[in-house]
Amino acid sequence: MPLKLTNTLTRRTETFSSLKPGEVSIYCCGVTVYDLCHLGHARSYIVWDVLRRYFIAQGYKVKFVQNFTDIDDKILARASKENCTMNEVSERNIEEFHRDMDALGILRPDRMPRATRCLEEIKSMIEELEKKGAAYSAEGDVYFAVMKHANYGKLSKRDLSEQQLNADGRVTDKEEARKQNPFDFALWKAAKEGEQSFPSPWGAGRPGWHIECSAMVLQELGETIDIHLGGADLIFPHHENEIAQSEVANGKKLAKYWLHNGMVNVGGQKMSKSLGNFTTIRALLKEGISAMTLRLFILQAHYRKPLDFTKESLDAASTGWKRLNVILCLGLMKHQTLNWPKPNIQESKITSLSKHSLNETLNLSRQQFIDALNNDINTSVAISILFELARPLRSLSNQIENGSSELISESDKHTSYSRWLLLTELANVLGLQAELPKTRTSKQSQNLDEVLIREAIQERKDAKLSGDFAKADKIREELNLKGVQLIDKKDGVTEWIQS
């Protein structure tokens, strides 16, 4: 089964075919850097990170470009509020963006252009649109005439009579009055008094939001690219306007495939800063929710569907991740006990999905995983396959933790290693990587009730002595879900560490 992707432009699920064999050019709309990112941003960048990882695993040479919008009304407003420059606001929040994305295990884009660094390209594109009669100036502003693009509305599938005026909320009443058509949009905005600005043939000002992305796509990837990515909230007007200005300026199709992820919802409403119902990535991580829990939470739903954010759904993802993480850590922590090769503890390299020769059962699991991602990047099904692969390894883990590793046959050790290796490689395609438990320190111990833990360990020991191994396993599992991992020593002593 070849890779199939749902193309917003055609509303069809299509077989993917790149413009150049073996290469993929991808542009992803980035953030406006005026504040910390929230879970909605995390969803976009995690799902597109998986798409990129999958292309790499399939042997493609990928060029992935993601921009920073560092010129915007929101940034200017924040700079005014904090009595600093627009650049200071942008630089600080770009650093914070990298901190969050790195924490989530998201691969850094190959290129991350900024609007402030491609102003000449932006102005050149506006001048080209003027030459073609698709742009006009009015009181220092420059607007794109939407009627000059014959297929305006082809992405959002709306005609102008159905469009909502000022859908992005970035246009003032005065700007509306200067337009020839209510749906024309700004390519260049004249500077207001005292506002940071940039020189241009039309006077001091700054570029409009949409033209920034069009210019950066052209600068970094060329006139036509394979895939353009973004959230569903960007379909109109942002991506619709990108298409219009790029295709008029360049005379060519902007992107072959348009992919859009669904929104994260809170109480039935889209998570957004404007509604005030957002939770930042930083806040979630500070609460002790692991980065991999957030990845699993996001990837358990299909990327195009809405994702409801609730405490219960996040707790369920946390429980699931802890179960999976124990198995992913197995080869990193117990390889000597199992006579497995010593693994590279550093971040795993994305490997080819057809690299290893496997037995029939494991080969089937690998193919099912590939088929799931080929089916419009169905990470929900792909994750279920990871848990299926992990299940037989759980009994192996239990035997080690119960101090009975000598009962594991050499044949089982060998077969289990192949299974574990495949599991880690497939998990890495989803960006799910083992989080090794931290060794317990006196400071960390203060966050856990050690008396209760010792009592639980003794209760487990008594259960094992009485032959009630089911109860012993249940106690160990309950402690594990609370972030406590038990280590049974050969002398009968059980130690614990905080994971």
UniProtKB/Swiss-Prot annotation:
GO molecular function: ATP binding; cysteine-tRNA ligase activity; zinc ion binding
Reaction catalysis annotation: tRNA(Cys) + L-cysteine + ATP = L-cysteinyl-tRNA(Cys) + AMP + diphosphate
Residue sites binding ATP per the record: K273
Motif ('HIGH' region): 31-41
InterPro entries per the UniProt record, alphabetical: Cys-tRNA-ligase (IPR015803), Cys-tRNA-synt_Ia_DALR (IPR015273), Cys-tRNA/MSH_ligase (IPR024909), Rossmann-like_a/b/a_fold (IPR014729), tRNA-synt_1_cat_dom (IPR032678), tRNAsynth_Ia_anticodon-bd (IPR009080)
Residues the entry annotates as binding Zn(2+): C29, C213, H238, E242
EC number of this enzyme: 6.1.1.16
Top-level class of the enzyme under EC nomenclature: ligase
Motif ('KMSKS' region): 270-274
Pfam families associated with the record: DALR_2, tRNA-synt_1e
Cofactor details (free text): Binds 1 zinc ion per subunit.
One GO term describing the cellular component: cytosol
Name of the protein this chain belongs to: Cysteine--tRNA ligase
Lineage: Bacteria, Bacillati, Cyanobacteriota, Cyanophyceae, Synechococcales
